[in-house]
Amino acid sequence: MVTLIEHSPVLIIAVPLLLAFLTPLIGMASKKARNAVVIVGLSFVAFLVFALARDVILNGIHTYTLGATSPSLTIPEGTMVPIRIILEVDGVSVFMGIVIAIVALVAVIYSLSSMKGETGQNRFYTLLLLMVAGAFGMVFTGDLFNLFVFLEITSISGAALVAFKTRFADSQEGGFKYIVVSAVASLMVLFAISLLYAQYNLLNIGALAAAMQYTMLDRIALVILIAAFAMKLGGVPMHMWLSDTYSVAPASITVLLITVSQASMYALMRICFILYGVTLDMAVVGWIIIAIGILSMFIGVTMAVRQTDITRLIAYNCVCEAGFMLVGLGVGLTVLGNPTALKTYGTMAISGSIFHMINHALFEGLLFLVAGAIFYRIGTRDLNQMGGLGHTMKFTAAFFLLGALASSGLPPFNGFASKILIYESVYQFNPVLTIIGILVSIITLAVFVKAFFSAFTGAVLPKYEDVKEVPKTMIAAMTIFAVIIIIFGLFPGLIVDWVVRPATNALVDQASYINAIMGAMP
């Protein structure tokens, strides 16, 4: 068991990669065997993630050096800097790993029925596993270049999955937009990395943080990295791709795309807090991120009001919810150099942002799965063409209502638990920001109430009289999200104490992250 945990960082990435190449071979022999192997494999990965999380929370940062005589040996004998590929897993990394593991497993369970009638399922599961491996790599890697590599893996596989249903023109358009935006963001990341590498001859994040001199080129690199990852997570004004992509991808893939966007949010946090940290005055950077967050909240919710396509409505709500996370992150960055303010409300704002990341994945994921279930049964996403579905799709209707209430931040659901942390902390920083957040949540509730009544209430339309509930595996996938939403809403204190606070502490502790690399010399 000890050896398994020691090697778990690389296994968590390697197992999905291996399964991605084995899936087509197994699928040619038996579809059932292929499905079973994928589910068992991702269940094993989830087990490794939770085991690693326990180890990190109890024992601190876990480093894994590929090719070293010992996985914990980060700096080879005879050198003063890390030169190998290093995976560095701390509280915030493993937190994101938990999010990815849960969502990936749910996505596969949902796909068993939702993608059953599609051709090319071997390719579908291969691409899905590649995207999962890339997402894990983004949050576990300890160097910037491999962050770029894993970002590329998620981008290419994600674009192919968005456009997977090639018979639909809008799917192809969505996939094309996703790959174009991803390519631009990736090139920006690569250019920023080249600016840093040219100065310091280093790629490891911890080593770079220790050597950082905050030159003009360093500041330019920071601006480029913020813009690139804000684009990937769908922050305004770089959100133009998100609704066109999320609304046309298979529902299970949209859920995974949310985690990829959150991996970009993680990268933004890692760069701001660890790579640059307190030495650089982050007040201006924090306010820029707050501004992006407020714009995302406002534009996201106002665009959602206008939508009649249920998936586009949820997609714009994703833009809005990303705004809440960005505001919490921005407040934390703004007071990073002020120990008193950081302790009073800064860490609470960061905790709210981090907690909202997993909550966002859960309730938005549930809403997209519900939208996928509706499309699976009636073949349309147009709310004006729906009505009375709650009579024949009772579970689906209940799941939509649950996700909508959670997204609106109402108790006793998980969205309330994370938003209240953001509201309370941000109020101490600037009350106006909290008022804006509350107003946005009220409008969000109104949007979802309207959508719920349009789709599920009223008399059953004649053309939908024979509509039945979706298959059991799709119900099971939605149930997993629903149960976690309720648990997180009823026991938020436990979740904050067990995983959110360790993630927050790791994010603001630049010295420990650096020492985990630079202190492990032979």
Residue map of PLM features:
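Structural signature of hydrophobic alpha-helical transmembrane segments
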Residues: 4-15, 91-102, 144-157, 216-231, ...
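Juxtamembrane/interfacial segments at transmembrane-helix boundaries in multi-pass membrane proteins
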Residues: 56-84, 187-244, 267-288, 325, ...
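Membrane-interface alpha-helices at helix entry/exit sites of multi-pass transporters
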Residues: 34-36, 174-177, 249-259, 381-397, ...
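Transmembrane helix-loop-helix hairpins at membrane boundaries of multipass inner-membrane proteins
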Residues: 1-11, 21-126, 501-510, 518
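Alpha-helical multi-pass transmembrane bundles of energy-transducing inner-membrane proteins
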Residues: 29, 123-130, 134-220, 231, ...
